[in-house]
């Protein structure tokens, strides 16, 4: 009896859609789910598909060619560990487990180490694109043993999204947790993109009182230019969607933004690495403060502030917001890729930043036209310290920074919260500052804690008795 080249464990929507994606590329796929009903449901809903159901782990594992390729699409955390433990008794040395869940990269490093010691291969794989991407072609970020990746690369390449130039949106990222780390930073950048767009929306509503139809038209125009991206594209559609009562749906959605924790992971890692991920972290905090709805409503009746005044010429202000949004986006990516560089050095991953930008060009949530500019920047100078220093991005900063400053100044004067736009200005000015007031902080630290300091006019480390 012939055996399958790959099996998928976990038949929730992402696992189901990836299995169907793999099947559509000409493979017969073994499928397994902890609950029998889920597996039966997938088979019943997809008659004629080359999906072969199994109802015991042993039969599932034995149905696969060796070395076995098993894609796990189960709940991250304890669920992943439990799935791995259930598979191990039936695996042979050299078999490959691919974890496609939203897994914390440190867990992937641990699992890679533990499974490698037992003779198994483990590939932690970031998968971006949501339900539709899983079915039609996601962006895929695999990390683990390079030789194991080579054995699964033909399948991953076939199921990945394809960019406009025909390149598949998958590449080997690096050892152990590199793939899941890049996916984590991707999600952090996604948080930043979404909050920047939300602030642009708030400015256009508060400053110009644009209607939903006007907002949709504005975003349509933006999507035809340098802001062209998946998130801008879907946002234009959101503005005009109505509910069953004829109300604009976006206007009746509660203003509390939920999260699944991946943005927080990105910010926590930035703190561990000493990376100033300010814009992305502000986007995480913006979601947190949005969840304080009752407190915000109460505070709105107590705390005073300015009432928003008209922002002036409509076309001029829209263009300023567009420029501010694009430069803010550039700052967000500059921070994210700077963090990737720091992580690559810390964990010895040897990341290829240009290739990472390339696989974000299709399939994933942050796909955008300007990602090619990032790839070009790293092709020109692979060692560039920060994307803001690349010629294209430097020119945009030169041309657009005044618009960003004007928009932030207007927002502050008119009581419109713009935490990520503000963070973009602060980061840009801090990064370009040859001198910062940190000398005073060092003096304070030495004063109360004898933490010492360095001088600009002498070599060495110094301490002063400040009360003498």
Curated annotation (Swiss-Prot):
It comes from the Bacteria. One of its GO terms (molecular function) is guanosine tetraphosphate binding. Changing residue 170 to F: In strain: ECOR 10. One of its GO terms (biological process) is D-gluconate metabolic process. Changing residue 422 to A: In strain: ECOR 10, ECOR 65, ECOR 68, ECOR 69 and ECOR 70. GO terms for cellular component: cytosol. Substrate binds at residues 102, 128-130, 186-187, 191, 260, 287, 445, 451. Pathway: Carbohydrate degradation; pentose phosphate pathway; D-ribulose 5-phosphate from D-glucose 6-phosphate (oxidative stage): step 3/3. The active site is at residues 183, 190. Changing residue 294 to E: In strain: ECOR 70. Homodimer. Belongs to the 6-phosphogluconate dehydrogenase family. Catalyzes the oxidative decarboxylation of 6-phosphogluconate to ribulose 5-phosphate and CO(2), with concomitant reduction of NADP to NADPH. This is 6-phosphogluconate dehydrogenase, decarboxylating. The gene is gnd.
């Amino acid at each position: 009896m012939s055996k399958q080249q790959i099996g998928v464990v976990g038949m929730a929507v992402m696992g189901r859609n990836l299995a169907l994606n793999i099947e559509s590329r000409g493979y017969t796929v073994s499928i397994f789910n902890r609950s029998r009903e889920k597996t039966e449901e997938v088979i019943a809903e997809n008659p004629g598909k080359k999906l072969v159901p199994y109802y015991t782990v042993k039969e599932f594992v034995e149905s696969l060619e060796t070395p076995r390729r098993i894609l796990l699409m189960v709940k991250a955390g304890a669920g992943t560990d439990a799935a791995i433990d259930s598979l191990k008794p039936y695996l042979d040395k050299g078999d490959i487990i691919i974890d496609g869940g939203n897994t914390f990269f440190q867990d992937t490093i641990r699992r890679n180490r533990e499974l490698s010691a037992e003779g198994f291969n483990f590939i932690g794989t970031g998968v971006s694109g949501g339900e539709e991407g899983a079915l039609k072609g996601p962006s895929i970020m695999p990390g683990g043993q390079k030789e194991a990746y080579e054995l699964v690369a033909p399948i991953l390449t076939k199921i990945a999204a394809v960019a406009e130039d025909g390149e598949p949106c998958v590449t080997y990222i690096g050892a152990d947790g590199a793939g899941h780390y890049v996916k984590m930073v991707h999600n952090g950048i996604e948080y930043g993109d979404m909050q920047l767009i939300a602030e642009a929306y708030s400015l256009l509503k508060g400053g110009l009182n644009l209607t939903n139809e006007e907002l949709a038209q504005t975003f349509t125009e933006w999507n035809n230019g340098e802001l062209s991206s998946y998130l801008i594209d879907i946002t234009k559609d959101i503005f005009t969607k109505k509910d069953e009562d004829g109300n604009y749906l976006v206007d009746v959605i509660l203003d509390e933004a939920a999260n699944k924790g991946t943005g927080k992971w990105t910010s926590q890692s930035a703190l561990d690495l000493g990376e100033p991920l300010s814009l992305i972290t502000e986007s995480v905090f913006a979601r947190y403060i949005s969840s304080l709805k009752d407190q915000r409503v109460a505070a709105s009746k107590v705390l005073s502030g300015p009432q928003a005044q008209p922002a002036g010429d409509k076309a001029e202000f829209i263009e300023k917001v567009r420029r501010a949004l694009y430069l803010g986006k550039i700052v967000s990516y500059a921070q994210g890729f700077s963090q990737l560089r720091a992580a690559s050095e810390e964990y010895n991953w040897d990341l290829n930043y240009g290739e990472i930008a390339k696989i974000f060009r299709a399939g994933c949530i942050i796909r955008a036209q300007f990602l090619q500019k990032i790839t070009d920047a790293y092709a020109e100078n692979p060692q560039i310290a920060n994307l803001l220093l690349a010629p294209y991005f430097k020119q945009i900063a030169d041309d657009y920074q005044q618009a960003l400053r004007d928009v932030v100044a207007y927002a502050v004067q008119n009581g419109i919260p713009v935490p990520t736009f503000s963070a973009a200005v602060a980061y840009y000015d801090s990064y370009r500052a040859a001198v910062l007031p940190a000398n005073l902080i060092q003096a304070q630290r030495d004063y109360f804690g004898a933490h010492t300091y360095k001088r600009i006019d002498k070599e060495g480390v110094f301490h002063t008795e400040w009360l003498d």
